[in-house]
Amino acid sequence: MTETKEEKVHKVFEKISPSYDRMNSVISFKLHVKWRKETMKLMRVQKGTNVLDVCCGTADWSIMMAEEIGPEGHVTGLDFSENMLKVGREKVKEADLHNVELIHGNAMELPFPDNSFDYVTIGFGLRNVPDYMQVLREMYRVLKPGGQLACIDTSQPNIPGWKQVFNAYFRYVMPVFGKFFAKSYKEYSWLQESTREFPGMSKLAEMFQDAGFSYVRYISHSGGASATHFGFKKKE
């Protein structure tokens, strides 16, 4: 029987969870931290707000958001990999944060009522879901009117030369790093496939609009290696 994308992704992240944080730093040369900080600055997050971090993984962005909104706010992190959540819960505990809850769930069917959150974030997770549009629509649904979505993910560089280098790096070098640092050549080979198949910046912006978002914009990071897309749910 052929594995579905959802089953394959779940198996990948259950296996790589112990080395995920270290590999993120190796693969991106720690640039993922810079990209997230740049995104946070542009979001202008307000204190005391309610946040959902979809595909939260090991909770890096959940923790950053919790520190930003302060003790009066609340962050819910959701992921479908219990092993990733286990790592995340340890990090939340070490950070001594009491305004973060990490739950097991499916981004395709968010277990929350409509209009629940002031902010929704998803970092390096959208490319791994079975249906991009379904997840975008779900995130739109749970946002409050006036709420903001921020999505960071890999992208497709357009700069001649850099595009070829980027593609070669993800296709040939990243799986080798995965084998050397995490003993997971097969898993990191698959992750480069998800990167290659993910829509480019302008196409993803169109998908945001199709899902209902307004005032959609995006910024590229590191020559288009990554991008952040922003969208708002219009006030009623």
UniProtKB/Swiss-Prot annotation:
Keyword S-adenosyl-L-methionine carried by entry: yes
Molecular function terms from GO: demethylmenaquinone methyltransferase activity
The organism's place on the tree of life at top rank: Bacteria
Organism in which the protein naturally occurs: Listeria welshimeri serovar 6b (strain ATCC 35897 / DSM 20650 / CCUG 15529 / CIP 8149 / NCTC 11857 / SLCC 5334 / V8)
E.C. no: 2.1.1.163
Protein name: Demethylmenaquinone methyltransferase
Gene encoding the protein: menG
Pfam families hit by this protein: Ubie_methyltran
Biological processes annotated in GO: menaquinone biosynthetic process; methylation
Function, in words: Methyltransferase required for the conversion of demethylmenaquinol (DMKH2) to menaquinol (MKH2).
Lineage: Bacteria, Bacillati, Bacillota, Bacilli, Bacillales
Catalytic activity: a 2-demethylmenaquinol + S-adenosyl-L-methionine = a menaquinol + S-adenosyl-L-homocysteine + H(+)
Enzyme class, UniProt record, top EC level: transferase
HAMAP family tied to this protein: MenG_UbiE_methyltr
